[in-house]
Every structure is written in structure tokens, then in C-alpha cells.
């Protein structure tokens, strides 16, 4: 996202994070600068807004590990709700468009069992874990406070991770299979995986189109985690017999997750012209 936005002449981009700059090479472009700021530090965030006076704020920060959030409620709420609320108030004060990233985990995963459909933006959230609950509450803060905003729900984002970033399912499968290691993947959880390049394109479209509301910015094909793994193995000509599909019960995850959280992109396709690629195309 930083790289793509910095490549456009009309944007001057400031990246800020609790951690050190993950893309220092962009510093040489003169279209990008990095400032180290903790989103939980209210005074520092206020000073940052005062110094930059941003036209657009894109919030990619979150405490996004469901198992960790389940046992660290206070920290999860502080980052995913309280800090988001502060950003929303500052965006309102500075008349900045606020683009806030959220997640498919705001849903309970039962819609397909009832209707056979994908989740649309109009369906009310019903999270099954604390991470999803905090992201839902963060969405509500943005919608209640801001007059110029977009909430971008994303899902299973994959692509080449930069140094310091945690990996993703595609890289995990590739690395394990290349090393000749077995990998267990869930065969009864469905997702709409999102290529990071398509996500970046969707965010840019949300900058240029000032429609308010929630948009699903994800892929347009619904796959199980096991199907994702097999597609990666087949394309890379790696040993697919090292992939062991298991059920959710067999995986014994400590935190509940939605079984089916495939999201519809028809709203984003119609209003934004968003047209993501399929996993096989990206590979």
C-alpha cells in the first residue's frame, strides 16, 4: 500500500507505526516519510495530526491474533476500539477521510448454512470471538463519529511479506513444502482470500471515491484453507502429499473461528470498479 500510493504523483504519504520502518527504501523517493508513533499514545497521535493535517488516514493497525485477543481483552480493546475511536475524532476534527480496515471475523460464519450465500455489507455482525467483537466495536465508533469514512473489511491477505512482517498462508505453505515439512490445514473453514496488490487497489479506490460506508475488499472466490494450500502446491510443483487436511475439531484451536466467512464484493465491484484476481492468477 505504501509503495503503490507513493508511486502516484498526487499523494504525499506518511507511514507511522509502533515498529521501525518496514520499507526504508521508500524514504529516497521524497514522496514518503516514516514517523514512529504508538497508536495507544493519545498525545503523540494528536501531535502527529497537528504536524501533518492529513487529507486521508488509512488505519491498518490492529491486534489481530484471535488467540492472543481472547486472553488479553484489555489490550485488544485499547488497540482495536479505544485507539480507533480517537483516530475517528481526530479525522472529524481535521476533516480527514478515514479508511479503517476491519475483518471477516465480525461474522459468526453460519450464513452459508442458512442461505448458501456470501456475507454482504448489510448483514449484521455476530462475532464468535473477542477479536471479532473488538473489530466490530471499532467499526461502530468510526461510523458513529466520522462524516467522511470507509470501512474496508479484508480477509486472508496474502502476498510477499516485507522484512519484519509476519507471513501469510500462501508463504507458510510454500516454505513448509519447500523444506519437505508436513503441514496441517483446516478443510472445513471457508474464506475469500485477498491478494495484497488487490487490497491496495481497493484502498486507492476508496480514497478517490468518497462514498461512506462498509465495503468488502477481498477476493471473489471462496476457498477452504486446504484448497488454498493445494493450489499453492500444484502451481509451485511442490509435494501436495505433505498437506494434511483436518477438521476444525481436529485442529483443536483454542479460540472459536467462523466456519464460513466468505464475503461478497458486489458492492465494491459496482460502486468502486473493484475487480480482484483469483489465487491462480496471482500465483
Language-model segments: which ranges?
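C-terminal amphipathic/interface module of NAD(P)-dependent oxidoreductases
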Residues: 256-283
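NAD(P)-dependent short-chain dehydrogenase/reductase
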Residues: 140-191, 198
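NAD(P)H-binding glycine-rich loop region in Rossmannoid oxidoreductase-like domains
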Residues: 39-79, 92
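Mid/C-terminal beta-alpha module of Rossmann-like enzyme folds, strongest
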Residues: 202, 209-254, 259-260
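N-terminal Rossmann/SDR dinucleotide-binding element
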Residues: 1-56
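Glycine-rich Rossmann NAD(P)(H)-binding loop
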Residues: 159, 185-190, 215-222, 271
Amino acid at each position: 500500500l505504501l509503495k503503490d500510493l507513493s508511486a502516484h504523483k498526487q499523494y504525499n504519504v506518511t507511514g507511522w507505526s509502533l515498529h521501525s520502518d518496514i520499507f526504508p527504501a521508500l524514504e529516497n523517493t521524497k514522496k514518503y516519510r516514516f514517523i514512529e508513533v504508538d497508536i495507544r499514545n493519545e498525545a503523540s497521535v494528536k501531535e502527529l495530526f497537528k504536524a501533518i493535517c492529513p487529507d486521508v488516514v488509512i488505519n491498518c493497525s490492529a491486534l489481530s491474533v484471535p488467540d492472543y485477543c481472547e486472553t488479553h481483552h484489555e489490550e485488544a480493546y485499547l488497540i482495536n476500539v479505544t485507539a480507533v475511536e480517537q483516530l475517528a475524532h481526530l479525522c472529524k476534527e481535521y476533516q480527514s477521510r478515514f479508511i479503517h480496515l476491519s475483518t471477516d471475523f465480525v461474522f459468526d460464519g453460519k450464513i452459508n448454512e442458512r442461505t448458501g450465500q456470501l456475507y454482504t455489507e448489510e448483514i449484521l455482525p455476530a462475532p464468535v470471538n473477542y477479536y471479532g467483537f473488538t473489530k466490530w466495536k471499532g467499526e461502530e465508533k468510526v461510523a458513529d463519529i466520522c462524516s467522511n469514512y470507509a470501512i474496508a473489511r479484508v480477509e486472508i491477505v496474502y502476498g510477499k511479506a516485507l522484512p519484519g512482517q509476519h507471513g501469510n498462508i500462501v508463504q507458510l505453505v510454500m516454505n513448509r513444502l519447500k523444506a519437505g515439512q508436513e503441514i496441517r490445514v483446516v478443510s472445513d473453514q471457508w474464506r475469500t482470500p485477498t491478494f495484497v496488490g488487490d487490497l491496495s487497489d481497493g484502498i486507492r479506490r476508496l480514497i478517490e471515491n468518497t462514498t461512506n460506508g462498509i465495503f468488502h475488499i477481498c477476493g471473489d472466490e471462496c476457498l477452504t484453507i486446504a484448497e488454498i494450500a493445494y493450489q499453492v502446491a500444484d502451481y509451485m510443483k511442490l509435494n501436495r502429499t505433505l498437506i494434511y487436511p483436518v477438521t476444525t475439531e481436529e485442529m483443536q484451536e483454542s479460540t472459536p473461528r467462523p466456519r464460513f466467512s466468505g464475503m461478497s464484493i458486489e458492492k465494491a465491484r459496482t460502486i468502486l470498479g473493484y475487480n480482484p484476481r483469483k489465487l491462480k492468477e496471482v500465483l
